[in-house]
Amino acid sequence: LKNKSLCAIAAPLIAGLALSMNVTTASAADKTAIVVGADTTFPPFETEVNGKVTGFDIDMIRAIAKAEGLTVTIKTMPFSGLIPSLQAGSIDAAVAGITIKTSRMQSVDFSDAYYKSGLSVLVKKDSKITGFGNLKGHVVATKKATSSVDYMTSHGIDPQYIKQFQDIDSAYQALETNGADAVIFDNPVNVNFKTQHPNVKTVGDLLTGEYYGIAVSKKASGLDAKMNDGLAKIKKSGEYHQLFVKYFGGDESGAVNAVEKPADVAVKD
């Protein structure tokens, strides 16, 4: 009798809990407004001009959100704060040229890849450095908590020779003022800097093949699927390709035309 009574009491409680869980998941998937984190020290993907956040990633996420019937609030922060903020649920998604990596996939979800990149070596025009192979013993600057740091430490660069900065502009400044012998960073950003500063050059081959994805909080259930759907829509409409015209002069070497799933393109680290 006691067991039957307990079952009778427990059944509606369990059903109610299950219903509550379903409602929570549904509300996350049915968001009409999202908060997107961005690091504005990553031109031409993210930058701030006259107090306005702009760039390839910003225009892209706004276009995706519009295609999905979502409104977007951009919340700026250092790159190193994006993943923790996604884990805490204080932001729903993040764009900042975030490389899809297996280690990051344990903490956050990713959309399908939207940009193919890689790391390159940037030096001053008169430098005798010809590529990554002869960087040992030289001071190399880069941005804190990025895949550039991971690559260097896993490929024989002594950490004492790695100068990490909160933003990439400070790394470039270190190079120009002889505080560093080279910069290793995402190639499109290095190329963007090089076009504006004729006293520097990129040397050697691309060091990696990396893909950027929209990072999504695991607390925002179903949002990654919406990002994928919106990305497919703006590719079909031509908006995606117009972004390459606007920010890269029509150079689509980084365009991802096929659907590239995170698990298939993630950097294994």
Which residues fall in each region the model found?
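Alpha-to-beta junction loops
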Residues: L70-T71, Q87-A96, H138-V140, D167, ...
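Ligand-binding cleft/hinge of the Venus flytrap
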Residues: E48, I61-L70, S148-Q166, K194-T195
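Short helix-initiation/N-cap motifs at beta->coil->alpha
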Residues: I74-P84, S127, K163-T177, E210
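Ligand-binding clefts/hinges and TM-proximal coupling segments of bilobed small-molecule sensing domains
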Residues: S147-F165, T202-V203, A232-D269
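A ligand-binding cleft/hinge motif common to bilobed small-molecule-binding domains
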Residues: G81, G97-Q106, T153, E176-T177, ...
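Flexible hinge/capping segments at coil-to-helix
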Residues: V123-V140
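Extracytoplasmic small-molecule ligand-binding "clamshell" domains
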Residues: A28-G97, S237
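Periplasmic-binding protein-like
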Residues: T40, Y115-V123, N187, V191-A232, ...
